[in-house]
Amino acid sequence: MAVLTITPLTIDNVELFARTAANILPEAWSVETYKKQVQNPDDISFLALCDGEAAGFISVWCVCGEAEINNIGVLEKFRRIGIAGKLFERAFAAAKAEKWYLEVRESNNAAISFYEKLGFDRVGMRKNFYCDPTENAVLMALDLENYCLMEKKQ
């Protein structure tokens, strides 16, 4: 059985974090941007390691009791084994935010379904939000005050 480790973003792992993000997302941020996040008290980011190999990440900004998921991703070979869920659990616990928000490409049905299983609801749309290719963003929100983390939508 694989050993999963979820570790906070630090200056020591920032380059691995940035490489992992770049391998998952076409529009990933630069190493310098992630270095700034390490210094930002509103940032909560985690790197997932599976048997010591970088497998995924989550980046969240928290302000005034609200959390915005900037990016989340899991490398293809590590998908569907629960890593994204573990990243969310760790972020939920660390952020202590009641309201959570994210945007997702309208065509990313797998991600939308996953977020809905976590309890997120569709709350809006941003027209032509993404580029390369141009695509709408589905806005999703979760109110943890009214949602028990131990209960999963079936």
Predicted segments with their positions:
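Structural motif
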Residues: 95, 117-118
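C-terminal "cap" of GNAT-fold acetyltransferases
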Residues: 101, 105-109, 118, 128-154
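Residue-level detector of high-confidence beta-strand sites
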Residues: 57, 123-125
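Active-site acidic-Proline motif in GNAT/NAT acetyltransferases
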Residues: 75-81, 106-107
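Conserved GNAT acetyl-CoA-binding A-motif
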Residues: 88, 94-106
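Acetyl-CoA-dependent GNAT
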Residues: 8-77, 88-90, 94, 143-153
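Extreme N-terminal starter segment of soluble prokaryotic enzymes
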Residues: 2-6
